């Protein structure tokens, strides 16, 4: 069996900690696993309200990829809005990435305008339509109420249903002690990633989550239609957080995707 190096990119509010089951399974079977904390996430000490852009947020991921030897490539795996961070990294370091796996993740082709259809579906699924925003999300206005919010965090009463509706209770309980506010400016940047032709040469895989209450299946299908990946997998009983709700099935999908790479 060939050894692969998987690098995991978390979504909003989460950190490298959310991938612990996948990292453990991969390491137990001879692979490498690196779980990145983006700036202001996980145990990264930065205040998320001070993160100024997507590139600022992604700096730990960029730093990791930049120090890889020229003859080494990794498999990037992202979750939720972490898909935008992964896409940005692919644009900057295409020679370091052998495969990109989007797990219920934002997948938008860089350098293209996001169609209104996708924007509208994204807003509806995430609860960011105007009448739902303050119901589901808490905002911090670090630069004053007259300016855009600096961070966003899901209200505790919605976390179970939106993130972990099919996940074990113990993982949900753990997550509620670790979730952090997420930087708004980073997510605005996801909508405007410059194009990079080399990115299209990186094979992409999408893992759909059938019982996802945040990135609902309709949103996933719209993204797949707009930028079709090489392969698609389905976890029919997974919530938004497949790393908790169906970790073994996701692990098998990762190995299957990795096996498609040339030796």
Swiss-Prot record:
Reaction equation(s) it catalyzes: methyl (indol-3-yl)acetate + H2O = (indol-3-yl)acetate + methanol + H(+)
Pfam families xref list: Abhydrolase_6
Keyword annotations of the record: Hydrolase
Gene3D superfamilies in the record: alpha/beta hydrolase
The keyword Hydrolase is assigned to this record: yes
Record-annotated active site: 80, 212, 240
Pathway this chain belongs to: Plant hormone biosynthesis
EC assignment: 3.1.1.-
Membrane-crossing segments per the record: none
Molecular function per GO: hydrolase activity, acting on ester bonds; methyl indole-3-acetate esterase activity
Keyword DNA-binding: no
Family in the record: Belongs to the AB hydrolase superfamily. Methylesterase family.
Purpose: Methylesterase shown to have methyl indole-3-acetic acid (MeIAA) esterase activity in vitro.
Designated name of the protein: Methylesterase 18
Gene: MES18
